[in-house]
Amino acid sequence: MIEFVYPHTQLVAGVDEVGRGPLVGAVVTAAVILDPARPIAGLNDSKKLSEKRRLALYEEIKEKALSWSLGRAEPHEIDELNILHATMLAMQRAVAGLHIAPEYVLIDGNRCPKLPMPAMAVVKGDSRVPEISAASILAKVTRDAEMAALDIVFPQYGFAQHKGYPTAFHLEKLAEYGATEHHRRSFGPVKRALGLAS
């Protein structure tokens, strides 16, 4: 992996998203400005960490970061805008929620939303840039908790296990029980379950 070279600036925010692929729930984003004086060991892409490690880092990031913020786009916004534009909107909301304005923003992936400060997309940034790793952890822990809460309301779908992704089990239950109000109606499997597919 090529080592990432930081822009010459002080306040750098990292931004990442979780939940573009699921059929249900919001896409959740986070923006984080880390404190160089309070380093956090073990930051990595949230998908490469155990749940226990993620939860511990989640608390440490919230405690030690100079600023952090969550953003989201709800299922109805995803359906209205499409998932890419909804993700960009959620990222803008996360950056806008920071109580310290960053001088530069690093975004995981290959596209940047329009922001009031310079920004750069970093491919595989969640493994290369600690600020993005921290954002990925905050976003994933938050979204996983939302799926666990939804699982209590709709236990038949298994949301706590698959987090809303289109697993065989989820698709089977979608066909059996239909869609909840939290499902993304613009996504193919949900459309088919609702009989809306053309």
Swiss-Prot record:
GO cellular component, one term: cytoplasm
GO biological process, one term: mismatch repair
Catalytic activity, as annotated: Endonucleolytic cleavage to 5'-phosphomonoester
Protein name: Ribonuclease HII
Hydrolase in keyword set: yes
Function: Endonuclease that specifically degrades the RNA of RNA-DNA hybrids.
Record-linked SUPFAM superfamilies: Ribonuclease H-like
Family to which the UniProt record says this protein belongs: Belongs to the RNase HII family.
EC number: 3.1.26.4
Gene: rnhB
InterPro entries hit by this protein: RNase_HII, RNase_HII/HIII, RNase_HII/HIII_dom, RNaseH-like_sf, RNaseH_sf
Cofactor binding comment, as recorded: Manganese or magnesium. Binds 1 divalent metal ion per monomer in the absence of substrate. May bind a second metal ion after substrate binding.
CDD domains named among the record's database cross-references: RNase_HII_bacteria_HII_like
Membrane-spanning segments: none
Record keywords: Cytoplasm, Endonuclease, Hydrolase, Manganese, Metal-binding, Nuclease
